């Protein structure tokens, strides 16, 4: 049975002090969790050190929102895998739609980041995929998403696929208040899982975690998680307040 992974993505919100307050509240409340539920929080780079201290000894995983595929060099503003590991980062979100849009990250660049991350001892790398509203309206959802999956996982071995989490985030549902229906989300998740079977094996497909992201909140999370191919959520706005994130967690337990 696959575990449920609930990851909060705090994006460009909170100073170190503000992030620490929220992290402490969450860590205090999730001391006792079922073994099949994993909680993850992803603060801004500048808050990683403080948040790492706040959740030390808890069962919360610390994540980063992006990283360079280079280990060092002339890459102004970027951060390397080794730098993240120094802060105790255990997973990295890669290929988020906002990075694809605002930072012009291509599937090829994202794949380089995936392969670079696999050379380091991160527990997980989260590969985000998703279609725009125009692509959905044109009936290209599965074509776009599965192409992103294939390109993102290029040259990833079957032994390494167990460290990959896939996150389906329809671009039109991120930060808009719109959410894919459980049927729409399940259709894409099912197709992604089938694609993993084709690319790797039935065993890899059965074990890979596929999260849903896109305006997830305490009101819709349970019905989404009840779908057979949805294994968790990548949560943006609703993870910024400890109370709302904890409400989501409690609704899944």
Swiss-Prot record:
HAMAP family: TIM_B. This is Triosephosphate isomerase. The keyword DNA damage does not apply. The keyword Protease does not apply. Involved in the gluconeogenesis. Catalyzes stereospecifically the conversion of dihydroxyacetone phosphate (DHAP) to D-glyceraldehyde-3-phosphate (G3P). Its main location: cytoplasm. Its EC number is 5.3.1.1.
């Amino acid at each position: 049975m696959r575990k449920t992974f609930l990851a909060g993505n705090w994006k460009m919100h909170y100073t170190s002090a503000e992030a620490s307050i929220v992290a402490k509240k969450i860590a205090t409340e999730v001391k006792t969790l079922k073994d099949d539920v994993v909680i993850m929080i992803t603060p801004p780079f500048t808050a990683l050190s403080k948040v790492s201290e706040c959740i030390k000894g808890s069962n919360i995983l610390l994540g980063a929102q992006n990283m360079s595929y280079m280990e060092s060099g002339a890459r102004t503003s970027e951060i390397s895998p080794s730098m993240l590991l120094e802060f105790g980062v255990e997973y990295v979100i890669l290929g988020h739609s906002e990075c694809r849009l605002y930072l012009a990250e291509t599937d090829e660049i994202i794949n380089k980041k995936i392969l670079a991350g696999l050379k380091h001892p991160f527990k997980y790398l989260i590969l985000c995929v998703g279609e725009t509203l125009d692509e959905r309206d044109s009936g290209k959802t599965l074509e776009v998403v599965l192409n992103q999956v294939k390109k993102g996982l290029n040259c990833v071995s079957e032994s390494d696929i167990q460290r990959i989490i896939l996150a389906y985030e329809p671009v039109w549902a991120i930060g808009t208040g719109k959410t894919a229906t459980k049927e729409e989300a399940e259709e894409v998740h099912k197709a992604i899982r089938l694609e993993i079977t084709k690319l790797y094996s039935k065993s890899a497909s059965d074990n890979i975690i596929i999260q849903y992201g896109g305006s997830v909140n305490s009101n819709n999370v349970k019905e989404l998680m009840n779908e057979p191919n949805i294994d968790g959520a990548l949560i943006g706005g609703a993870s910024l307040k400890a109370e709302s994130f904890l409400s989501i967690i409690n609704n899944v337990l």
